[in-house]
A protein has these predicted regions:
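Catalytic metal-binding/acid-base residues of hydrolase active sites
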Residues: 56, 225-226, 275, 341
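Short acidic/glycine-rich loop or secondary-structure boundary segments that cap or lie
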Residues: 60, 230, 278-282, 287, ...
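Hydrophobic faces of well-ordered beta-strands that scaffold small-molecule active sites
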Residues: 51-55, 118-120, 159-162, 188-190, ...
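Mid-to-C-terminal alpha-helical segments outside catalytic/metal-binding sites
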Residues: 1-49, 53, 61-117, 145-153, ...
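A general structural motif
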Residues: 249-252, 291-296, 314-318
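Aromatic-lined glycan-binding groove of carbohydrate-active enzymes
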Residues: 259-307
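Active-site gating/metal-coordination segments in enzymes
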Residues: 116-258
Length: 380
């Protein structure tokens, strides 16, 4: 696939400018108020590139290496699940195994869905934060090496986000540098907690990780694996339906109230599932910050001042909800996502975006791929 520059004044094929421009007239109020990227990477036929920011690959070798340790006992999505949910999940993993691990099947599905490039990342449970740090590093390297191999084999269809052992910050920082500088990965996937410890837990010292991520200018994709205190969410798949967005909400709130976003401005953190509940229930945080001193112990500005710096995928399953997300945070902060290949994913991401009311075509193009291309440096 060849890309052609669309920056005004540049007719040079293969020369891609991902510049920010002043907000144009029309479009959502939030987008007009803050400005957004005006250029969009296009293919040879002039169609705007479509990039999926939220999709998973299961590394079977890594899973086999740790199978004797019974990883599921550490996974909230399994630990807090009814017997029926476990049976349904086992069947899903069996039925969707080719989609999870066979690239040719994946590419056929991408073509069917109208996706040009996936920013493929590990299956969310394959962070393995519960392992001993040395083993965690070994497995992370296996996963990252395979992702790099996929990108090298199909460079026109994939970029990759790796994984690092956050249970040991020194190893995590070193592996992050290797991912970016040696393997060419565009970022990493993390969970909203480290085996139950918050990302702001002083014992983890993850400010070093966030500082390195900012220095390298890479994407952090923060994906949950169920809620860690899911005793009340075992039936009806609630530890996914409610637990996944809840864990994202809790993890993001700690990053905001704990000052991570204030100490590391410019972090590029993408939140799946449209940001959990924060994308639509943000006003309560701001009220608490104004009303209570214990909400102002670290941050100096209202929580939404920091929330607006995050990026959100489009997985809302409803055009009006997606419209509200865009209105609040701006089209520049929203990226097409599918959660491929899981059953809770969006099967028609392009159709969902096209059905959003009152959304100008230029903003649709940015959401479908322009924003992701800018963040992931596709076309550079």
């Amino acid at each position: 696939m060849m890309f052609t520059c669309v920056t005004p004044g540049c007719n040079q094929p293969g020369h891609h400018h991902l510049a920010m421009a002043a907000a144009r007239k029309g479009g959502s109020k939030a987008a007009r108020s803050k400005g957004h990227a005006k250029t969009v990477v296009r293919d040879r036929k002039g169609r705007a590139l479509r990039v999926d920011i939220h999709c998973h690959y299961l590394n079977r070798d890594a899973a086999a290496k740790l199978a004797h340790l019974n990883p599921s006992q550490y996974e909230p999505s399994v630990k807090f699940a009814s017997q029926l949910t476990r049976e349904v999940n086992v069947k899903q993993m069996h039925d969707r195994a080719p989609k999870l691990s066979t690239i040719e099947v994946r590419i056929a599905d991408m073509d069917r869905m109208g996706i040009d490039i996936q920013a493929v990342c590990p299956a969310p449970q394959q962070t393995y934060y519960w392992t001993e740090p040395g083993l965690g590093l070994e497995v992370s390297r296996m996963i990252n090496d395979r992702l790099a191999q996929i990108v090298a084999t199909w460079p026109d269809r994939f970029v990759a986000l790796g994984t690092v052992p956050l249970q040991n910050v020194e190893l995590a920082v070193a592996e992050l540098e290797r991912c970016v500088k040696q393997l060419g990965l565009r970022g990493v996937e993390i969970n909203p907690n480290v085996a139950g410890r918050e990302l702001t837990d002083p014992s983890l010292n993850l400010d070093r990780f966030f500082a390195k991520a900012r220095e390298l200018d890479i994407v952090i994709f923060m994906h949950p694996i169920g809620f860690t205190q899911g005793d009340r969410l075992m039936d009806h798949y609630l530890n996914n339906l409610i637990g996944n967005p809840l864990d994202t909400t809790v993890g993001t709130s700690h990053l905001i109230f704990g000052g991570v976003m204030e100490r590391h401005p410019g972090l590029k953190i993408v939140l799946p599932h449209a940001g959990g509940f924060l994308g639509h229930y943000w006003a309560r945080m701001d009220h608490g910050w104004r009303a209570r001193p214990d909400c102002r112990t670290v941050i100096k500005k209202p929580p939404t001042s920091y929330l607006k710096k995050f990026f959100f995928d489009t997985i809302t399953f409803d055009p009006e909800m997606l419209r509200n997300l865009i209105d609040k945070f701006g089209a520049a902060q929203v990226l097409l996502g599918t959660d491929y290949p899981f059953d809770m994913g969006e099967e028609d991401p392009v159709g969902l975006i096209n059905s959003v009311p009152r959304l100008p075509s230029a903003e649709k193009e940015r959401i479908m791929g322009g924003n992701a291309a800018r963040l992931l440096k596709i076309g550079r």
